[in-house]
């Protein structure tokens, strides 16, 4: 398990796994080998793939409903990256030209078979990372976390000073009693 993808517009919340083998595609979204790991960064182009029309579960069945500007969130390593859809293309299965790296952009492409039930082509939805502005709730949580950290640090320092003073007092008492 690498992380999760969340596309609220089409009700997708799925796990992401590395590799494109059938066993991976049967349980979630596949991170295609030889593409950037989905952790973001300028010059990266991560490619994720999932089934359409799988008999037991809905994966990327509604990917074609995404429109330019729609958000895609990818959560990996306790960080959530937000991407905005910039393009939708239908290509032959062997056409990988849209998956190339752009050294000035942080890109994510989602691929699935198309059209539904025929699977003669691939639908590629490309998205570019957008900067996120912290919501007021996030800012309050960050400030609260900083205060908690300051309090814990202060408590540790106070305990350490008390331990040093107690050690000196015990040693002095032992010397006086000896």
Identify the residue ranges that each predicted region occupies:
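Solvent-exposed, non-transmembrane regions of membrane-associated and secreted proteins
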Residues: 1-151
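C-terminal single-pass membrane-anchor helix
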Residues: 139-178
């Amino acid at each position: 398990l690498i992380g999760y993808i969340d596309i609220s517009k089409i009700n997708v919340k799925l796990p992401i796994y590395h590799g494109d083998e059938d066993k991976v595609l049967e349980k979630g979204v596949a991170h295609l080998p030889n593409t950037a790991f989905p952790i973001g960064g300028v010059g990266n182009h991560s490619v994720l793939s999932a089934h359409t029309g799988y008999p037991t579960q809905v994966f990327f069945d509604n990917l074609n409903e995404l429109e330019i500007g729609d958000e895609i969130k990818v959560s990996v390593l306790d960080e959530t990256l937000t991407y905005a859809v910039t393009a939708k293309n239908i290509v032959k299965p062997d056409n990988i030209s849209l998956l190339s790296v752009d050294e000035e952009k942080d890109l994510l492409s989602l691929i699935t078979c198309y059209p539904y039930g025929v699977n003669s082509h691939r639908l590629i939805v490309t998205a570019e990372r957008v900067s996120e502005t912290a919501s007021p709730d996030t800012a309050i949580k960050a400030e609260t976390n900083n205060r908690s950290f300051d309090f814990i640090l202060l408590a540790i320092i106070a305990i350490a000073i008390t331990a040093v003073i107690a050690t000196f007092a015990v040693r002095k008492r032992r010397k006086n009693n000896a």
